[in-house]
């Protein structure tokens, strides 16, 4: 325990919280242009071809974003919206693509959890 005199001379230093999503710069989402759309394999013990894209954001950052859902229409030069949220089994992927916004279509034939995949309510 520090004495009062020691604390007067050198006060306690606050810990600075580090952001998990630095490229968003405290915004909820950011717009960007796809520079590369590709698949990659997850860490052990999982096995799949995960759809991801490299995105150049409006603030100059270049990040990797995960494309959730079954099937997508993204290609190079597509304009997309990204949000925060990492993919645990893909190292370096800290962002998700927002489905149903800008050039990214919603998931086709999706009936449940539609809001997460940009799908409108089906007609009765």
From Swiss-Prot:
InterPro entries: NA-bd_OB-fold, Ribosomal_uS12, Ribosomal_uS12_bac. Pfam families: Ribosom_S12_S23. SUPFAM superfamilies: Nucleic acid-binding proteins. The keyword Nucleotide-binding does not apply. GO terms for biological process: translation. Gene3D superfamilies: Nucleic acid-binding proteins. The keyword ATP-binding does not apply. The modification 3-methylthioaspartic acid is found at residue 89. Coiled coil: none annotated. Keywords: Methylation, Ribonucleoprotein, Ribosomal protein, RNA-binding, rRNA-binding, tRNA-binding. One of its GO terms (molecular function) is tRNA binding. One of its GO terms (cellular component) is small ribosomal subunit. Part of the 30S ribosomal subunit. Contacts proteins S8 and S17. May interact with IF1 in the 30S initiation complex. Belongs to the universal ribosomal protein uS12 family. NCBIfam families: rpsL_bact. With S4 and S5 plays an important role in translational accuracy. Interacts with and stabilizes bases of the 16S rRNA that are involved in tRNA selection in the A site and with the mRNA backbone. Located at the interface of the 30S and 50S subunits, it traverses the body of the 30S subunit contacting proteins on the other side and probably holding the rRNA structure together. The combined cluster of proteins S8, S12 and S17 appears to hold together the shoulder and platform of the 30S subunit. HAMAP family: Ribosomal_uS12_B (MF_00403_B). This is Small ribosomal subunit protein uS12. It comes from Erwinia tasmaniensis (strain DSM 17950 / CFBP 7177 / CIP 109463 / NCPPB 4357 / Et1/99). The gene is rpsL.
């Amino acid at each position: 325990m520090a004495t009062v005199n020691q604390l007067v001379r050198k006060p306690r230093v606050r810990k600075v919280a580090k952001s998990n999503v630095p490229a968003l710069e405290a915004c909820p989402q950011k717009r960007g242009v796809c520079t590369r759309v590709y698949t990659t394999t997850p860490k052990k013990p999982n096995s799949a071809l995960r759809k991801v894209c490299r995105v150049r954001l409006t603030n100059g950052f270049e990040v990797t974003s995960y494309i959730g859902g079954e099937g997508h229409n993204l290609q190079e030069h597509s304009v997309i919206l990204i949000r925060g949220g990492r993919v645990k089994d893909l190292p370096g992927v800290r962002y998700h693509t927002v489905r149903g916004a800008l050039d990214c279509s919603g998931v086709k034939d999706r009936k449940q959890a539609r809001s997460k995949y940009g799908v409108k309510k089906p007609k009765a």
